[in-house]
Amino acid sequence: MNFKFFTNNSVNLIIAGFLLIFSYSCQNAENDSTKLKDPNFSYENYKPSGNEIIISRSEYVNKLKGFWLAQCIANWTGLVTEMDKIGNIGEIKTGEFYTRDDWGKEDQPAYWGGTKDFSRTIDFVFEGDDGNWGADDDTDIEYIYQHLLYTNKVSKLSGNQIRDGWLKHIKNEEENFLWVSNQRALDLMISGTIPPETSNPEKNPDFDMIDAQLTTEIFGFFSPARPDFAVEMAELPIQTTARFNAEWISKFYVSMYSMAANADPNLSIKDNLISFAEKSRKELPDDSYASKMYDFVKKQYYDGIPWETIRDNVYQRYQVEQKDGYDLTSRNMRCNACAAAGINFAASIVSLFAGEGDLKETIKIGSLAGWDSDNPTATWGGLIGFMIGADGVEKAFDRTFSEEYNIHRTRQNFPNGIDNFTNMANIGVFITDRVIQNELGGGVDLVKNLWYIPKSN
């Protein structure tokens, strides 16, 4: 045996094998990193300046999946108690509000006398691996806006694009799962009115209802860590149905959602949420009843008052005594304006503070707080779900869930009536790619799968 010949050939074979493996690995890595690439968008080269916020796109997919999943859990759980407890003013009286002791007990009828077929018990509502989550107005309008942004290839929708999208995807003659200001806006669109005129108080008397705050939070995720542009991006969709306090409240939520993309890893979920809320408080003018509601609930929380008592105090102060300029009771509206932006915002701040960043506890408190209880639960469930990601949501509940979403339960004319959270999250990332590159002056690194987001001035 020629030892020298054997050694040289062995080395050559080893080197050749290594190069082959290295080449294959690099090719796979490149394929993996560029898999999440929008075929309808032209990515530009970007040279980081070193003064950007850096966010992983792959982690963002998991976070957006967590948003959709937790929002669906929270939405459907909150629907169990929706409008069960709205107070005792006027002709409609619903008795004492729920407390923590009512969790796990039989659900009481809503104020109109209806019961919920999907659950007779006040408890979490889940969809197993073999099912699909039903759309509701807390998720489906956000789905429409995401679809419109992507298919129109824009970062900011025009009034005509919003109107055309609503008329295409929202039913008119049949049950359409719209209420108060959303329904008024649709009726105005049908007659030819274009947003933002659809929320003009002279045309839409429901301009101060809850609608916009449950349909526009998602815009915050499309402008990660840049609430300045997130609020700008969401302004017209918000003004499609809301003005004044209802508009400011919606911008508060959008701002918080945007900030969640750059949470401080050294802080707890609770402390991050409070930080987002405190910074987003600037969206609420100091002389607005919305800002006073926020401050009122916050003070009582830090005074150590139980959440049930804070909620009761909110009811007494704002619906009974009509303090801080909140005069909706005097307007003698149906169910004492139980779907108003203000009272439901105050209830949501109760569950935000008292839930202390715990997903399950926040959903519980939101469900038991009263009024339009599926809305605050969906808002905070979606936000916390985003912060902990889809895997974190499943860990919190110690189980797995379906990720299929039935948009055609409530809406129409989409390519896929049954969508899934992974696809929905990918579309969200593509929209965010466009915002970061075209609006924020940042960059998308498809190889490293990173966003570079310039900090605001």
What are these regions (language model features)?
Residues 2-14:
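Bacterial N-terminal signal peptides that target proteins for export
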Residues 22-25:
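C-terminal motif of bacterial Sec signal peptides marking the signal peptidase cleavage site
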Residues 27-33:
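Bacterial lipoprotein signal-peptidase II cleavage site
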Residues 51-55, 186-207, 216-226, 235-240, ...:
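Accessory "access/gating" subregions that flank catalytic or transport cores
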Residues 69, 131-137, 141, 146-250:
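Active-site cavity-forming subdomains of large catalytic enzyme subunits
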Residues 73, 77, 84-102, 242-245, ...:
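Catalytic phosphate/nucleotide-handling subdomain of diverse soluble enzymes
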Residues 79-126, 139-141, 163, 173-176:
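Active-site-surrounding "flap" and adjacent substrate/cofactor-binding loops of secreted or lumenal enzymes
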Residues 111-136, 407-436:
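A structural-propensity feature for long, helix-poor, extended segments
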